[in-house]
Every structure is written in structure tokens, then in C-alpha cells.
Amino acid sequence: SLSSSSPVNLAGAGATFDVSGATTPQTTGTLSGVAGSTVNLGSNNLTLGGTGNGTYGGTIAGTGGSLTLSGPGTETLTGTNTYTGGTNLTGGGTLIAGSSSALGTGALNTSGAGGTLAASTPGTTLGNAVNLGSGSTLTVGGTNDLGLGGAISGAGNLAVSGPATTTLSGANTYTGSTTIGGGSTLAVGAGGTLSSGSTIDLSGTGATLDLSAATSPQTTGALSGGTGTNVNLGGNTLTLAGADSGTYAGVIGGTGGLTLSGTGTETLTGNNTYTGATTINSGTLAISGNGSLSSSSPVSLTAAGATLDLSGAASPQSTGTISGVAGSTVNLGNNNLTLGGSGDGTYAGNIAGTGGVTMSGTGTETLTGANTYTGATTINSGTLAIGAGGSLSATTPVSLTGAGATFDLSGATTPQTTGTLSGVAGSTVNLGGNNLTLGGTGSGTYDGTIAGAGGSLTLAGTGTETLTGTNTYTGGTNLTGGGTLIAGNGAALGTGALNTSGAGGTLGTSVAGTTLNNAVNLGAGSTLTVGGANNLGLGGTISGSGNLAVNGPSTTTLTGTNTYTGNTTIGNGSTLAVGAGGALSGGSAVNLAGAGATLDLSAATTPQSTGALSGVAGSTVNLGGNALTLGGSGSGTYDGTIAGTGGSLTLAGTGTETLTGNNTYTGGTNLTGGGTLLAGNSSALGTGAVNTSGAGGTLGTSVAGTTLTNAINLGSGSTLTVGGANNLGLGGTISGSGNLAVNGPSTTTLTGTNTYTGNTSIGGGSTLAVGAGGALSGGSAVNLAGAGATLDLSV
């Protein structure tokens, strides 16, 4: 053996250092020598120790012989070496290869402190296998580009130190970490692979992982790194696997894609530009801080539990389409996610968070999961579809901001609920056969088209929804929550009925004079309030047992034949009109509840019927030349004015109607059903005659001493009962063949010249008096039919 610290120098061509006959491994200091010299290892190991540096240009040979660099110095080998036993780096030293055969044919092995491997000639590629011993690190790189073509295996670590590029072209399997230093590049060449069991850390500014020349997709463990670093995918896909988590702040670029197949969390905090697909097979891909994905990268979550977490991002996020299976999750946090590109995507998982989703692509994004995000849903272009089993959050407002934008519910298998609906002309909501419910307290204006055979729209919120498009959905419109629905044209509510239930709602128009021809069904206990600022026409039949309220200052005109049985209320300053062909409902009581309230029948083309009439002073019923019949068994008090040239009032019901206003209608008053009419003043019955027919009725006064000067015509077979609690005067001529009955305890005084031929009956406790200028009818028999009955001619 030589001294372990003795440097060996083969100074001349032909010089030989032969350790083949040694029976033990040999150790020296450094090795130097010129080309043409030889070191013959035989099958022995030669260890180079010490701290010095050496350059050997000759040939190292030996079958089974190996070379170990155990010192911290630098050994440069430039010869064409043929030893087969391998090369070992153990002490942290540096081994520089001058040619592709500098390390013989055996493996390069690291252990202990490992060492550094570099090339003295740019572009040198070593084909040796590399075995990284557990706990050791092989540092590669330096100033010249180096290629490693052999397979790298073992549990040790690989460190890349530049500024050179180290290119891997072997199929690598090592499980230790991979660290790429500042200014250094680790590249994968043709046929090469990263190790799927190794994590990668780009630890310094300018560090680069370059996969652009790889000829197959690449897989590694977690990816970490700071700002100013780069991963260049080229056209390749990089898969991050394993159980570890990583945070990468650099930029991933290229036309390739990124796949997450590990169980940990990969966090990206850089502005990534790669345009290939982002695939999450398992684990969590998180965007945090100033990080982002490429706006054109489609995202696919392929397995239950896969998660795309945007909650830590500091800004809105954009991707291409999103696809995925049930059980996967996109967590928006409070961020907005914009889906772009021209492709189509179907996502069956849950999009969650307080953020929103924006559709800006030209394709179709179909959601088949039960999504819970509560931010806005915005469709700038393309189609957002809800598929089988899918739904949006019940509180997300939906806005279609571009012509051609489509919200397609036709494939949904359950009714859908959102917040408000907004959008521009040229956009479309396709209901198919589904119901869309708009909830919440917000307001929206939708100028596009709502279509769908059998589809319906429900306003369940308390806000205002304005529809200005020519809508074609056929399933009807429902008001249930007390909100307001504003129609911008006659087709705004499609072709189906307008239905109310629950809290009902308000119906108005944004364009004065709009007429809706939809049938209206007023559900039991609900109220439809109509009117608002602009005049509105209702041409369809209003049916049901619910109520109708008119709230101005506009005029609501009915041109349909209505049958509803709930109450009709006309508010302060409001007008309910009946137009040509229209009709009030005979089963609805009408209440003019505020000063300035008007019931206008002047344009009606047929006689009108309603229930009892009520109202306050200052309100008006304008009969025009039409007849108004009050039916039913209910009672009403009307303190306003009934006007109308030629218009008449008929009490056909069995209830009591009290009129206290100064009425001016001229067409007369008719009692036909046995009900009671109470006059509150002498002009309460207008200027026309009081006529009885059929069951006749009762005439009285609510103010004692009132005298009515209206002529009275008692129809054949009918009876007019007069009297009641208060004294009443009848100053007009009573004619006809019908009967007059006086029913007290009050006094009824006749001051007209009467000619009727029917019977006169005075009930018990009642008084019929004849006043100044008055006369009994000579053709009428008088019967004092009860005790206390009085006929008083003394006045």
C-alpha cells in the first residue's frame, strides 16, 4: 500500500500505476497524470483522499475495479476510462468528468457526505447509472452543461447547482429530494424521466425545471419553490404525486398540463401561464396569495375527494372549462371564478364558498352537482346549463351580460331556485319543462327571452323583478312571496297563467298602456296587487278565491271576463277600470279604500256585477252609461260618489248596501233581490227612479229625516219595504203595480202624488204618514197589519 495522503502523479506517457496485484483496497491522495499514462485497478478499489485537487488525463482500467473520491478536493478525469466497478463519492468532494466515459462503465454511487459531479467539457453526457445512498446528496451542475443518461436510483438526494443545465435522459427512480438552486436548470431530455418518488424544490431565484424536451409525461412528488423560479412544461404534462404537500411561488409555463395525483396539498402562489389541462385526481390543488392558474387551462377533478381550493387567493381566478365527478369540490372562498375557453365542461361536484362563478367562454358548462356558492352567477357568453341532479344556490343572483349568453335549465331534473335574474336583450333563459324560482330581497331586470314548453317562473322573494323581453315559456308565472313583478310588454309573462299563493305579490308594468292577456288565478288567502306608476291592462280571466288590490296612481283596466270570489280593494288615488269586453267579478266585494280611489265602468260594453260595494268619502264610482249590479249576501257602506249619465245601480243581493255620498248617476236604482238599501242623504240614489222587480227589497235611511225625491216604480209582483229605524220621506211619485210595505218602528212620510195599484201594508209599530202635498194612491188597498200600525193623515 501507499501512504493514504500521498498524491500520485503519472507525469509521462507510458507511465503506469498498477494496483491490480494488491490484496487490499488502496488509498492515496490526489491522482494526476498525462494522457497516455495508465492506472490499472484490476479488481481493487482506489480511494482518493485528502484535500488537494488533481487532474488525470490518462486511462483508468480494471475489471471490477472501482474509484472512490473520499476527500473534499476536486478530481478531474479526462481520459477514456474502462474500469467497471463503479465510482463512489463519499466525502463531499467534486468529481469533474472530461468525457462521457470518464467514470468507466460502472455506476456512480454516493454515500456519507456524497459529493459534486460536473463536466469540464460543455455538453458531456454520462451514461453511468447513479445510486444515491440514503442520507447522501449528489450535487450536479457547475459551469458546464451536463447530461445524465443513466438511471438514478436510491434513497439519497439530488441537488442541481448552476449556472449550467443538467439534463436527465434516463428513467429515474430515486426517492430522495430534488433541489434546484438559484440560476440552475434541471432539464429532462428525450427518453428521460423525473423520479415519481422525489419531491422537487426550486430553491433560488432563476432556478428552472425544464421539461420541454421530454418525450413523455413526467411525474414527481410535491413541488416547492420561491418567486423568480420557473417550470417549463413545453407540451408535456407534469404529475405531482405522493403524500407530501408543497408550495410553489414560481411560474409554471408551457402548453402542457399539470396533474395532481397525491394525497397532500399543492399550493400555487405564482402567476402560472401553462395552457394545458389542470387535472386533480386526488388531494388538493390550492391557489393562494397572488397565485393564479392560466385563464385558458381547463380544470378536471376526476375523483371524489379531489379539491380545487381558491379560498386563499388574493384576486379573482380564471380557468378554462371545469369538469369533474360527484364528491369533488371547488372551494371559492370569497373569490370569483371565471370559466373561459371554447370547450365544453360537465361538473358534478360542489362549487362552494361566498364567491361567484362567471361564464365567459363560447362553449357550454354543465353543472350536475348541488352547488352551494352564494356569490353572483354571471354569464358573459356561452351557455351555463344545469343538468340532471344539478342546482345552483338558492341565493345566487344570475346575470346574463352578453347577447347570446344562455342559462339553460332544460336538462335539470328538479325545480331550480336562484336569487334575482338580470340580463341584456339577446340573452336567453331556457326553462325547458322546469320551474325557476327567484328568491331573496334583491331586484333584477331581465331584457332577454325566457323560453320553455311547460316551464314556469316563480317570484318567491320580496324584491322587484322586471321582465322586458318577449317571453315564450308556457308553464305560467307564480307570485308567492310578496315581491313585485314588472312587465315590460304584453308577452313578458309568456303564455301561461299568472298564479298567486301565499303572500302573493304585486304586478305592474314599466311601459304605460301594456296589456297582459294571461289568465290570472288568485289562490286562496293570497292577494295580487296591481297598478304602480304606469297604466296596466289585464285581458285574461281572473279566477280563484284570492283577492285583488289596485294600488295607483295608475289605472288598471280589466278587459277579461272575471270570476274570482275574493275581495277587490282600490287604494288611494288608484283607478280600476273595466274596458270593452271586460267584466267585474260578480262574486267579489269591491272596496274603494282611499280618497281618490276610482271604479270606472264608463268604457265597459256590458252591464257589470260585483258583490257588496264599500268605500270612503272622496272615492268615485263612474258608471258612465252602464248598469252596476251589487249581488251576494254581503253588506257594504259606500261614502263616495256614484256618477254616470244613464248609469244605473241594482241591488240584487240579500245584504244591506248603505250609500252616504252625493250621488249623481241618472239611470236609476233597482231593488230586485230582497236586499236592503239605506240612503245617507237625499241624493244618495242619484237622480233616476227607484225601481223594484222580482223579490224587490227594503229602502231606508241611515240619517233620520232624510227625504228622497226620486220617483219610484213598483214592478208587478214585487214589494218595496220602507222604513227601518230612522224616519224617511218619499217625495217622488210612486207608480206601478207592485206593493208598498212599511216596516218601522220609524215613520215613512209620503209627499208625492202616488199612483201605484199594488197593496199598501203597514206593519206593527210602523207609521205611514202623508205629508204636505202628498197623497195616498187611490188604487191601492191599505192594510194596517200589526198592533201599533198607524196611518197618519194629519200632517
Give a label for each model feature.
Residues 40-44, 50, 104, 132-133, ...:
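Solvent-exposed beta-strand/loop surfaces, strongest in extracytoplasmic domains of secreted
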Residues 1-36, 54, 61-62, 74-132, ...:
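Surface-exposed loop/turn positions within long extracellular repeat scaffolds
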Residues 53-57, 149, 245-249, 344-348, ...:
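C-terminal segments of enzyme domains that contribute to small-molecule binding surfaces
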Residues 17, 29, 44-46, 209, ...:
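Extracellular beta-helix/beta-solenoid repeat scaffolds
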